[in-house]
Amino acid sequence: MYLKQYVGEARIIKSTNDMVYIGTDLPEEYAHSNYTNTLKGANAKAKANAAQGIPEMLMIADEREYEKNRKTKHIKDAKYGWYSYVTRFALPVYEETGDIERYNVFRAILLVRHAEDKRLYLYDIMKIKKETSTHFQPEDLTQ
């Protein structure tokens, strides 16, 4: 699985200066979480393709919110609770010729657990939603 290459890495969320690590539990949770299992169609495809941009998604995340741990099964892995951050990512839409026609932009929530070792670990990406007003063309990236 693509995510395994990130295990052990860390990124700083620029808006908060939080260091977020990629733990060994991310690949399994990302692929098989309750949220992932509910996804269909374009959102399922978006989550699968978003995996390759996780380092960048962490760096640009903002709007941090804290939530206490509510499930006993997470007492150890999220001893100090959870943080969620808003992030964005873009996926190309291709023409029949294979050229990129435009990019679809998605908004998502990064779910981060605050573990017993006092580190923050990315746990899952959730609430993926296409931003209907945000499309940009390939040439927008070069200007």
Write out the residue ranges for each language-model feature.
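Ribonuclease/tRNase effector modules and their secretory precursors
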Residues: 1-143
